[in-house]
Amino acid sequence: MEIPRVDGFQHLHWSWQECLLSAAWPFLLIALVPGISLVSVGVTSRFRPGWLKPSVVALLLALAVPAVFFILGARKKLDAEGWAFLLIMPGLAEELVFRGVYQPLLNRVFGKPWRLAGAEFGWGLIITAILFAGSNGLVAVDPQLHARIVLHAAIAPFLMSLVSGWVRERTDSVWPSVFGHNLSNIVIPFASLFT
């Protein structure tokens, strides 16, 4: 099923409209649900003390995942719209939803009993990573709503989601995860410029 394109989006090849809608719904949730705020979804410029070094290390590790796919032969050439889209939208839309909304809500339910390298986390991080991997690995839904998930298409997003989830817990903000997500999206296209 595809959302009909509204004026301004009709001639674009990338899913700008869908990503903007995805990025907007956490803000609707903030407006409608008591107890959910900009800070609780990680839309804050205040980071936990000591956040920078471990976050940079984690995000560099996350960049290794698409780098491995490039080494294994993945290539992707982009036009200007593709570059703009990958540098802005996927991380913004997906991190606000998965790390901004799902992970904190699941943390409320399950708590954060574990600690790793200065970040407290729990089942919220793990479940969110599974949901994220499933949404990225989901390649087909037929009219009877039978879904097909391609495992190899879900593994890299699962690993990236674990890292992004940890960064979200370590920093109390979605912004480093948004940045890392968008950066990881351009590793293969950037490396493809030189092949």
Regions found by a protein language model. Name each.
Residues E2-I3, L32-S40, P66-I71:
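Transmembrane alpha-helix boundary signature
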Residues M1, W25-P26, V56-L63, L125-L131:
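Alpha-helical transmembrane segments
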Residues P49-A58, L116-F121:
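Membrane-water interface at loop-to-transmembrane-helix junctions
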Residues S37-P49:
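Flexible interhelical linker loops that connect adjacent transmembrane helices
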Residues L63-T195:
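Transmembrane helix-loop-helix hairpins at the membrane interface
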Residues G8-E18, R46-L52, R148:
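Interfacial loop-to-helix junctions that mark the boundaries of transmembrane helices
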Residues A24-S37, L96-L105:
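Membrane-water interface of transmembrane alpha-helices
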